[in-house]
Amino acid sequence: CPTFMIGAWDSRPSSGRIILMGYGRRIVFCPPGGKNFVAANDVARGIVAALARGNSGERYLLAGENYSYAEFYRLLAERTGHCQHLIHIPAWSLRIIGAIGDLLGKAGLRSEVSRTNMRILCIGNYYTNAKSIRELELHYRPLAEAIDEAVAWFRLHGMLPK
C-alpha cells in the first residue's frame, strides 16, 4: 500500500493538490499535522518488486519520507524558488472549521471541510518503509525529486505557470 504519492501524471489532480495549494503563494496556512510522502515512480517500482520478490500473503507499505505540513511547504518553496510565509493554524480552530463544514453538509451544501478531514490535518500520519527496503530491496528517492517532477508536469500541462 502506498502512502501519499507525489509526482508526475497527476491529471486530476489528487494528491498533487497539496502542491497547487502552496505553489507561488506568499502566505500559506499550515495545519499542525504531517504525513508520509512517497514518489509515485517509487510506488510503481514497489508494486513490481512486490510481485517479483514479495512473499505471498505479506503486505508492504510503500512509504517515503515523513514531513510535517510546514516542512513540506518549506521544501516546496525552496524547490520552486518562491518566498513564502507560513501561518500555523491551531488544531482547535480546525476543529471549529470542521464542525461548521459538517453543519453546511447537513444543510445540503457540498463542502470538502468536515470534522474528520480537519482531524486528519492535525495528526502526524508518519510511517516507516523499513520492511519494503529490507524485503523488496527498494530504494526510495528524496521527496524533493518527486516535487520537482510534479511541478514540471503541472507546468507542462498548464496547471501551474511556467
Write out the residue ranges for each language-model feature:
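Structural signature of the Rossmann-like NAD(P)-dependent dehydrogenase/reductase core
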Residues: C1-F4, N36, L61
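Flexible, glycine-rich beta-alpha linker
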Residues: C1-S15
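Short, glycine/charged-enriched secondary-structure capping and boundary segments
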Residues: R12-S15, L20, L75-A77, D102
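A conserved pocket-lining segment of Rossmann-fold NAD(P)-dependent short-chain dehydrogenase/reductase
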Residues: I18-V38, G46
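Short aromatic/basic micro-patch
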Residues: F37, N66, Y126
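Mid/C-terminal beta-alpha module of Rossmann-like enzyme folds, strongest
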Residues: G46-S111, N129, R134, L143-K162
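Active-site loop of classical SDR/Rossmann-like NAD(P)-dependent oxidoreductases
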Residues: V113-T128
